[in-house]
Amino acid sequence: METTALNSQKAPSVCKDREDCQENSILQKSGPTSAGGVESGQIFNGYSSVPSTGMGDDAEHSVPTATTTLVAEVHHGERETWGKKVDFLLSVIGYAVDLGNIWRFPYVCYQNGGGAFLLPYIIMAIFGGIPLFYMELALGQYHRNGCISIWRKICPIFKGIGYTICIIAFYIASYYNTIIAWALYYLISSFTDRLPWTSCRNSWNTANCTNYFSEDNITWTLHSTSPAEEFYIRHILQIHRSKGLQDVGGVSWQLTLCIMLIFTIIYFSIWKGVKTSGKVVWVTATFPYIVLSVLLVRGATLPGAWKGVLFYLKPNWQKLLETGVWIDAAAQIFFSLGPGFGVLLAFASYNKFNNNCYQDALVTSAVNCMTSFVSGFVIFTVLGYMAEMRSEDVSEVAKDAGPSLLFITYAEAIANMPASTFFAIIFFLMLITLGLDSTFAGLEGVITAVLDEFPHIWAKHREWFVLAVVITCFFGSLTTLTFGGAYVVKLLEEYATGPAVLTVVFIEAIAVSWFYGVTQFCSDVKEMLGFSPGWFWRICWVAVSPVFLLFIICSFLMSPPQLRLFQYSYPHWSVILGYCIGTSSVICIPTYITYRLVTTPGTLKERIIKSITPETPTEIPCGDICLNAV
């Protein structure tokens, strides 16, 4: 299937190595270097130039003064690259494997047919998630830019996508780090001989508190609550002090201190760039796998564990006839791999030019999917144990979804195991490291985008810019730190990010495969890797992946999620508020399209053609070519 781009094709690269550039003294698209990386004459956005040394004063071959000056300005340095290839892989894995892999996949799996759910999940991964993942890695590595300035080289009219991504990242940072703060509060509370969520004798407990595992004879009623549930709801969240979304109450000083510590860790992990964050992920990306292995072995030895495993994997093939199962599979793989957040573009932009991003995409996607699958065993062996201890069905124990599955059900199970303090400490440390990895990545996507777009302002002041970003995210988190903050977290999670990111990636896929052209894109990949993507990838990028995304978007719009948290049902106006928050980021795309068409000179046809045609090196402002110094 041969496709023709809607914009004009770029001239093929003729400057393939340092010697070629030196011979011709030209500014051309850079290709692989002999060392496999970026030579000193290469500029981070994919253009290279080395001043001629063998042409003398021949006026016919002299380089224009403006170009010579430009080269002199940028020749002093290079774009930062990863210290080691494994730093990049661990960073991508740490970003893709997050808290959702632990709490969302197991729940979605058993809700949608158990083992039968793996079939639509794998299909959606092969035809939708992995192609998009591969596309973003290749784009970032070839053009060597963040999510804003990269559009000058693809299709300038869609530059608003980059600004949309930055706003979405701010919304995510506003609630995601609050969940990490909850885990940190649990971790601090775990340093006791007896975990505080095992008893009903604390100041936050109510008369309805009933301990399943008490040696006393107890009667469980419809109004009974477990100590773990009351610890989470009344002590950590203090949600009983809020009347709902319309009155979230005051700010919890305990959670505020926790999130301040979280943001401090984040700042000193990313303030110097990927060379430092690449070292931090050696701990934050590997530690969760050590803990998951320990918990898997421990869970498998618990009484009743097999009940949980059967409940998790027992296939219900009739479920595959339901549209909702396929929607959940598509949404799960998409949000698990995480294209559309600007992170993959940013991380790949620090790779060497001929790094095998195709192999990276397959390896990291496989690791992500396997982690989700194995996490199900970690969760459900413990849920089977809980069901055995309570003499209940696993479905009754597994009714909690989202964070409650971790902070109530799993926390309660850990508290009633031998060596409970040890397991609680490593479990909540694992949650914190999983969350930190994703936050490092999300903020790096924004930082790279802004520094690449405005290097003349921020290139020499990265530390101050990162500090400004972290402080902004902290103040943005204040509403989620209130007594009703959990209501805000749920609203932002469901409406502010999901639909907006889906829209971004849908437009991105169309812009790259239809406007930039899948033929040109495959040519770029061949220039980097030495081989061109096959027909499977081309068909996925042009047709299958956009349909995959459109399918999820339409499903969401037709059946928006009904918001409910604990016993609280969200008011009707909260749906409108959610859509407004989501639209506030996506509006950047049509706004920039309008701005571009209005400010571009010429007739309407000339404006459109110029706006969808990649800019040449001489058209890109000097500020966009100057080095992102870190």
From Swiss-Prot:
UniProt PTM: Phosphorylation at Thr-276 increases 5-HT uptake and is required for cGMP-mediated SERT regulation.
- The stretches that face the Extracellular side, renumbered to this chain, are 113-115, 187-252, 298-324, 381-421, 484-494, 559-574
- What are the annotated glycosylation sites? 208, 217
Any GO BP annotation = regulation of thalamus size
Q: Keyword annotations for this protein?
A: Antiport, Cell junction, Cell membrane, Cell projection, Disulfide bond, Endosome, Glycoprotein, Membrane, Metal-binding, Neurotransmitter transport, Phosphoprotein, Sodium, Synapse, Transmembrane, Transmembrane helix, Transport
Q: Which residues carry this modification: Phosphothreonine?
A: 276
Provide the topology term for how it sits in the membrane: Multi-pass membrane protein
Q: Which SUPFAM superfamilies match?
A: SNF-like
Q: Which residues bind Na(+) 1?
A: 94, 97, 434, 437-438
Primary location group? membrane
Q: Which residues carry this modification: Phosphotyrosine?
A: 47, 142
Spans annotated as Interaction with RAB4A: 616-624
What reaction is this protein's catalytic activity?
A: serotonin(out) + K(+)(in) + Na(+)(out) + H(+)(in) = serotonin(in) + K(+)(out) + Na(+)(in) + H(+)(out)
- NCBIfam families in the cross-refs: Na_transp
On assembly, the entry states: Monomer or homooligomer. Interacts (via C-terminus) with SCAMP2; the interaction is direct and retains transporter molecules intracellularly. Interacts with filamentous actin and STX1A. Interacts (via the N-terminus) with STX1A (via the H3 domain); this interaction regulates SLC4A6 channel conductance. Interacts with SEC23A, SEC24C and PATJ. Interacts with NOS1; the interaction may diminish the cell surface localization of SERT in the brain and, correspondingly, reduce serotonin reuptake. Interacts with TGFB1I1. Interacts with ITGAV:ITGB3.
Which family is this protein grouped under? Belongs to the sodium:neurotransmitter symporter (SNF) (TC 2.A.22) family. SLC6A4 subfamily.
What protein name applies here?
Sodium-dependent serotonin transporter
Organism field: Cavia porcellus (Guinea pig)
UniProt lineage: Eukaryota, Metazoa, Chordata, Craniata, Vertebrata
